[in-house]
Regions:
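ATP/pyrophosphate-binding catalytic subdomain of soluble kinases
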Residues: 133-202
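Active-site histidine-anchored catalytic micro-motif
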Residues: 44-155
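ATP/nucleoside-binding phosphotransfer catalytic cores, i.e., glycine-rich phosphate-binding loops
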Residues: 212-268
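Charged helix-capping and loop-helix junction motifs
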Residues: 47-53, 196-201, 227-234
């Protein structure tokens, strides 16, 4: 099993790469960390052209079985459309794993018919308990370990960071939910912002195709005055307004407990 690591958003820390290479070797997996992961160009892991070229290179490599996004941050939206165009044949034989800002690429590649999943990334090894998250991702990529999956999955599902999903809605990369369950998570946002993002997401016509919504972990930042509505009440409110069932909590989030959510198969 050969897994390529690229950084479509922000740079990967070298110590994180080294630790994950060791964990991968112990699991019998060859980790191929692209040099682009360590480039720095302002906020990004290299210019757009370099990040796109690295991703397209590993997508086209028939010797690579899976593509693992190094980390989140910001920037994958700038290359997502181009990444999913004119796909090489080898790209369709791979699985693509990531979350957070990587959700832009998950959406684009899924719409193009590729196998994608929400799940832990390489830089997560630096979190408290992060080695467990990395082992979970490696076990799923290498052998499809079902223990790594979000335990409440009972049918087709998709998972996104809420800010990323809100940015996707109304664009050519908006997910086609087509009866899938939607899992969302968020980090470091005030409740009023979460309320606003859910307003935008649930107001889009495509949201009506969601079978049900579950809420992952959301690290809420304090506002200058109390919002006055609890997190789950916010989610229930916008689900009720849109006629979509709210189905409770989900085991995903920006943390080491983050579980894997494979997106449903799709023909481009």
């Amino acid at each position: 099993m050969r897994i390529a690591v690229v950084a479509p958003s922000c740079p990967l820390k070298r110590d994180a790469a080294t630790r994950v290479e060791e964990l991968a070797a112990a699991a019998g997996v060859t980790l191929v960390v692209h040099p682009q992961c360590f480039l720095e160009d302002g906020h990004f892991a290299g210019p757009d052209a370099d990040r796109l070229a690295a991703l397209r290179e590993v997508m086209a490599d028939p010797g690579i079985d899976a593509v693992w996004f190094a980390r989140g941050g910001y920037g994958s939206n700038r290359i997502a459309v181009a990444a999913a165009n004119d796909l090489p044949a080898a790209a369709r034989a791979k699985t693509y794993l990531g979350y957070s800002d990587g959700g832009f690429l998950l959406a684009a590649l899924h719409k193009a018919g590729l196998r994608v999943a929400h799940g832990p990334m390489v830089q997560d090894v630096a979190r408290e308990g992060g080695e467990a998250a990395v082992r979970r991702a490696l076990a799923w990529l290498a052998s499809g370990d079902r223990e790594a999956l979000e335990p409440g999955l009972d049918g087709p599902a998709m998972a996104f960071n809420l800010v990323v999903l809100s940015s996707l809605m109304g664009t050519p990369l908006e997910p086609d939910f087509n009866g899938a369950e939607l899992l969302i998570e968020e980090v470091d946002e005030e409740l009023y912002r979460i309320d606003r993002f859910l307003f935008h997401v649930s107001s889009q016509p495509g949201f009506a195709a969601v079978r049900q919504l579950r809420l992952g972990r959301c690290l809420v930042r304090d506002n200058d005055r109390p919002f006055g509505i609890e997190l789950e009440a916010v989610a229930r409110h916008w689900c009720e307004r849109a006629g979509v069932r709210y189905a409770g909590r989900a085991d995903i989030g920006h943390d080491s407990l983050n579980r894997i959510v494979p997106f449903p198969s799709r023909n481009a």
